[in-house]
């Protein structure tokens, strides 16, 4: 399966606009389920709203992604961003906030998730506050101190989660900045790495990287690949390139129909060797995404 993806970060940086634009992309399925949407739908008590939001998201997000192989599901925030806003509301220091966010990782609350975090550019707090006042969602603190607190905590959050952070500046062309975020998300979903010895590694549809994996060949049918994924394995597709590496690259892209990692190499003997198996474990699966 694919990692679930979230667009996260400081309020009023056109996150919803970006997600709506992504709805037109065939490789994304967009879920607009942030705190405000759930609050409007269920009219819950704000004193326990963060708990209800997180509980709902954990249940919904799991069931919403079952059985899909050809799209990445992207959500309006991570379920656990309630922890960030709880830290802000309780006035946690940077050190205490970092410990709380690290605890989320220790508890595996972010297993099978990746995210991109939007941050307010320096000296734009007043502009973001003005946007918040215009939106007037009834749940945000609408002042510059709140924007600064969000920026501080989401910076720590992005560091702990190893998530790319993108600054959004209301003084600049917003459409161009939104396009930059969309391109970043696209590059996470279709990720290419050029390695030494004429080896290309292609992460198609943000595949979940597990210790358990199955090596497949380009002649294997999609049903076999889906079966391996359903059994909890990462699919590694080995693809001999021959003399024309670029042609092999194009063919591999056309052949990929499910989330997988394709390893494309000129050396077909290496692709069937024990060295290749070690390479998969040490250089393909045993690594962290920069996302």
UniProtKB/Swiss-Prot annotation:
Name used for this protein in its record: Uncharacterized 33.9 kDa protein in PE 3'region
């Amino acid at each position: 399966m694919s990692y679930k993806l979230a667009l996260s970060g400081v309020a009023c940086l056109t996150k919803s606009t970006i997600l709506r634009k992504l709805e037109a992309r065939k490789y994304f399925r967009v879920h607009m389920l942030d705190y405000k949407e759930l609050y409007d739908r269920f009219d819950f008590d704000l004193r326990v709203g963060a708990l209800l939001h997180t509980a709902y998201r954990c249940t919904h997000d799991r069931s919403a992604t079952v059985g899909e192989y050809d799209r990445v599901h992207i959500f309006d925030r991570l379920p656990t961003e309630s922890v960030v806003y709880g830290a802000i509301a309780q006035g946690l220091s940077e050190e205490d906030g970092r410990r709380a966010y690290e605890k989320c990782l220790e508890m595996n609350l972010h297993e099978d998730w990746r995210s991109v975090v939007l941050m307010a550019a320096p000296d734009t707090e007043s502009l973001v506050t003005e946007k918040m006042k215009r939106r007037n969602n009834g749940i945000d603190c609408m002042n510059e101190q709140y924007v600064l607190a969000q920026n501080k905590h989401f910076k720590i959050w992005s560091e702990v989660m190893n998530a790319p952070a993108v600054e959004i500046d209301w003084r600049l062309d917003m459409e161009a900045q939104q396009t930059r975020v969309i391109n970043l998300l696209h590059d996470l979903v279709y990720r290419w790495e050029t390695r030494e010895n004429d080896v290309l590694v292609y992460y198609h549809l943000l595949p979940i990287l597990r210790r358990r994996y199955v090596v497949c060949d380009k002649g294997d049918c999609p049903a076999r690949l889906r079966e391996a994924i359903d059994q909890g394995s990462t699919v590694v597709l080995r693809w001999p390139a021959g003399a024309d590496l670029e042609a092999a690259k194009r063919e591999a892209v056309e052949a990929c129909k499910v989330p997988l990692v394709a390893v494309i190499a000129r050396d077909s003997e290496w692709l069937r060797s024990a060295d290749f198996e070690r390479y998969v474990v040490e250089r393909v699966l045993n690594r962290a995404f920069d996302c």
